[in-house]
Amino acid sequence: MVKLRLKRYGRKGQVTYRIVAMNNLSRRDGKAIEELGFYNPRTNESSLNIANIKRRIEQGAQPTNTVRYILAKANIL
């Protein structure tokens, strides 16, 4: 099953995340199928590829709770 989830980047104390489509059995920082945007929790900044996110959801991808919150805040869900 494909999930939309966060992939951790950055360094200790200055973490950013990329929103990616991944197999649910992959590791958190494992190989992603597709990168769909990023999220910076320190500044609450996010950049999303809306067309690709909608396409992935239509194909059956399930967002995690945190990604669902980010998408709802951006009025995608």
From Swiss-Prot:
Signal peptide: none annotated. GO terms for cellular component: cyanelle; mitochondrion; small ribosomal subunit. It holds the Pfam family Ribosomal_S16. Keywords: Cyanelle, Plastid, Ribonucleoprotein, Ribosomal protein. It is found in: Plastid, Cyanelle. GO terms for biological process: mitochondrial translation. It comes from the Eukaryota. Its main location: plastid. One of its GO terms (molecular function) is structural constituent of ribosome. Belongs to the bacterial ribosomal protein bS16 family. PANTHER family: 30S RIBOSOMAL PROTEIN S16, SMALL RIBOSOMAL SUBUNIT PROTEIN BS16M. This is Small ribosomal subunit protein bS16c. It comes from Cyanophora paradoxa. The gene is rps16.
